[in-house]
């Protein structure tokens, strides 16, 4: 019984990975093969689903980001303020998924960075985007 549940979980994970890979070309085209958070080019990029994830991968809720950004999102307590001051501009992106991730990162940084608190005080997000941003945290 346990083995069949583990097998089912693995199959579900593999199916999701394949579905994300299917978005790869469209993500690369949209991102112009650059990290959608920092604009960094010439580095390995990977798909990042902005939580909470939907039942099926959705390109509008998925970003193409660098390994450095992925690591920062996985371990937000290690964010270094000076390295992320670009968030002051990124949060104004026209893409909701970028706004959500930037907003969440700013809130993590605001616990110890004055500049992040100042940016948050100035940011205005569309109601729907703000609800998405507040629905989860890093």
Labelled PLM ranges:
Residues 2-6:
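N-terminal alpha-helical interaction blocks
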Residues 7, 73-112:
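Polybasic, low-complexity binding patches
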Residues 8-9, 13-20, 28, 37-64:
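Histidine-centered nuclease catalytic patch
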Residues 65-69:
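Zinc-coordinating Cys/His ligand positions in small cysteine/histidine-rich zinc-finger domains
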Residues 112-119:
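An accessory alpha-helical subdomain
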Residues 120-126:
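OB-fold/S1-family RNA-binding modules
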Residues 129-138:
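C-terminal, charged low-complexity interaction regions
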